[in-house]
Regions:
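Membrane-interface helix-loop junctions in multi-pass transporters/channels
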Residues: 1-134
Length: 134
C-alpha cells in the first residue's frame, strides 16, 4: 500500500494549519478576555466550535453531497484548518462515526481513554518539566 501523498497536499495542510492556529489564538484570547482565565472558556469555545464546524464539513463532504467537494478542499479545511484550530474536532468526529457504525462500546472506550490518557500525559509532562526546571 502506497501511503505517500503529493507535495501539494502537505502544502495545503501547512497553510490551513497556520490559519487554524492563528484563529484558535484569536478566538481563545477574545473569549478569555470576556470571561477571565479561572476556567478555560477560550479553549472550550474553540473545541466546541471546531466540533460544530467539522460536523458541518463532514456532512457537506459526504460522497452523496450535491456539492461534489474536491479532496484538496477537504484536506485544506478539515486536516489543515481544523487540525490547526483544534484536534478535538477530529476526536469528536471519530467518536461520532464509531457511534453511527454501532460501535458504542468502542466509542465509549475511545472517549474515556482519550480523556484519561490526555490528562495523564499532560500531568506527567508538566510535573517532569517542572521538576527539571527546579
Amino acid at each position: 500500500m502506497n501511503l505517500s501523498l503529493p507535495l501539494h497536499a502537505y502544502l495545503l495542510v501547512a497553510f490551513g494549519s497556520g490559519l487554524g492556529g492563528a484563529a484558535r489564538l484569536w478566538v481563545s484570547t477574545l473569549v478569555s478576555r470576556g470571561t477571565g482565565t479561572a476556567f478555560p472558556w477560550g479553549t472550550l469555545a474553540v473545541n466546541v466550535a471546531g466540533c460544530l464546524i467539522v460536523g458541518i464539513m463532514a456532512a457537506l463532504f459526504e460522497p452523496a453531497s450535491p456539492l461534489h467537494v474536491r479532496q484538496d478542499l477537504r484536506v485544506l479545511l478539515v486536516v489543515g484548518l481544523l487540525g490547526g484550530f483544534t484536534t478535538f474536532s477530529a476526536f469528536s468526529l471519530e467518536t461520532l462515526l464509531l457511534i453511527q457504525r454501532g460501535a458504542v462500546a468502542a466509542a465509549t472506550a475511545y472517549v474515556v481513554a482519550s480523556v484519561a490518557l490526555g490528562l495523564l500525559a499532560a500531568s506527567a509532562a508538566y510535573m517532569s518539566m517542572a521538576a527539571a526546571l527546579r
